[in-house]
Amino acid sequence: FWASCRADMIAKWPDLVRALHREANWHCFSIGLESGSQKVLDIMNKVTTVEQNHAAIDLVNELIDEAEREGRRPPVIFANLMLGTPGEEPEDAFATLRMAARMKRGIPSISLFTPYPGSTLGNQVIADGLSLDSHKRYDRFPNEAKMKGVDYQFYGDLFQGKYDREVGFCVPALMARQGNPAEALT
């Protein structure tokens, strides 16, 4: 089964998550981690912490190890991650990618912030006149600028590995793990 989870709930009830994983045979944990930076999580009004994100990853990593030791199919983490939010700085982006690299069997789904109308942050960006979007360009994986004030060249360089030393590992290798949800089900 595919389990859609919140990091704070995994961190709060690890024994329940462990039992549900074993009983329901969860093989994919879809977790909206969003960021490895507390500052960015707060900007998003995510109401979770970086520590809860790490605890969720660590628990699923333990479940992976257990399943492998027992000869069962190990679960994967399908992690939703967002970069390019208002106020994000390079170190915040590096922290998000470092967090993603902690996942033993992770499929990072990395997208750039899109200021969707109706969302609190999207409404604020639009009200501040920073949105470059029209409804025709509201896609999950944008290939063009969505917001004024974001250094999209930085993110392109980051994804190409030009900041690997600062991040501490090969970012293109992490990006190669990126996939779609259907891959987590096979």
Regions found by a protein language model. Name each.
Residues 2-185:
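A structural motif corresponding to the C-terminal lobe/cap of the Radical SAM core domain
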